[in-house]
């Protein structure tokens, strides 16, 4: 049995220039450098191993042979009592469009359910990422601002857990407008604009749609609060000191966010963010760290002997 199987076939296509292929290759190189038995799997078949490494996860509905393979791998590893390591996008992607850092976890991708091996982390990784991405220091909580920003996300993926995003948007606007007269700015996801639903909520007083060319950073400028379902884009708002509201307990910002819209107009909670930020940064790794085998070493104690 292999120690590690790296599932290149968890991708829809395998191309040398593909960033995800580069990440998988770096992981494989690091494990091989430690003397582990590694299989680089490019076929649509399940291979016995202690740790199956793949890009992404599966949602409630899925199609495509590579997604079916992911599902088969997850079921096989669970049945055998072994582990899956899904690789997920960076929570700092607003400052990291090239995905220099991505996230690693065990047996699932939901931040408050699965193992990221990042509890009570030191500030070291945050300082490393902040320097590499040229991020400013975390700003004090903002106690001024005007509009409420609602950020939408792609529907149908594993993050949404089957939630109807159109319904969520309409209900969220209704709840906010029932207690607040602040302007509401809707920021659609570029890959899922939801034109009909956005048009529907634009019928409420002082509800506006973000212009297509506007960045998240620009839409957060002057915001009083920002509302998300569970998108990792909420991290950008937290770092800027903007109070955040989320609807799902598996949002990466859940521990430092509000969940009850009833206080959004006047009195959002402003919790301490320092340890949360250190822990979040600690589940991100670079390709160079992969090549050194640091991710395997970090998670080794969490794997079945």
Where are these regions (language model features)?
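N-terminal pre-catalytic "stem/leader" segment of glycosyltransferase-like enzymes
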Residues: 1-51, 55, 157, 301-305
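Well-ordered, non-membrane alpha-helical segments in soluble/globular domains
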Residues: 20-27, 64-72, 164-175
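A donor-sugar binding/catalytic signature common to diverse glycosyltransferases
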Residues: 213-258
């Amino acid at each position: 049995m292999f120690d590690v199987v790296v599932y290149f076939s968890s991708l829809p296509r395998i191309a040398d220039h593909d960033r995800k292929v580069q990440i998988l290759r770096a992981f494989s190189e690091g494990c091989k450098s430690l003397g582990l038995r590694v299989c680089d799997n490019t076929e649509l078949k399940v291979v016995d191993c202690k740790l199956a490494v793949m890009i992404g996860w599966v949602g409630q509905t899925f199609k495509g042979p590579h997604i079916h393979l992911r599902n088969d791998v997850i079921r096989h590893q669970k049945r055998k009592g072994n582990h899956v390591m899904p690789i997920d996008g960076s929570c700092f992607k607003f400052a990291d469009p090239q995905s220099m850092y991505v996230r690693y976890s065990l047996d699932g991708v939901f931040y408050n359910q699965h193992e990221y091996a990042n509890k009570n982390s030191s500030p070291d990784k945050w300082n490393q990422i902040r320097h590499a991405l040229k991020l400013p220091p975390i700003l004090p909580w903002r106690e001024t601002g005007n509009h409420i920003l609602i950020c939408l996300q792609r529907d149908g993926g594993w993050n949404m857990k089957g939630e109807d995003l159109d319904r969520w948007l309409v209900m969220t606007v209704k709840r906010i407008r029932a207690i607040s007269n602040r302007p509401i700015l809707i920021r659609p996801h570029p890959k899922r604009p939801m034109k009909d639903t956005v048009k529907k909520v634009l019928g409420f007083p002082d509800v506006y749609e973000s212009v297509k060319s506007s960045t998240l950073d620009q839409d957060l400028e002057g915001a009083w609060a920002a509302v998300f379902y569970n998108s990792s884009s909420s991290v950008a708002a937290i770092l800027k000191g903007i109070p955040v509201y989320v609807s799902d307990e598996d949002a990466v910002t859940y521990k430092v966010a509000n969940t009850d819209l009833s206080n959004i107009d006047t009195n959002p909670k402003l919790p301490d963010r320092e340890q949360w930020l250190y822990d979040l940064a600690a589940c991100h790794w670079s390709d160079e760290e992969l090549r050194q085998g640091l991710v395997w070493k970090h998670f080794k104690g969490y794997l079945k002997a």
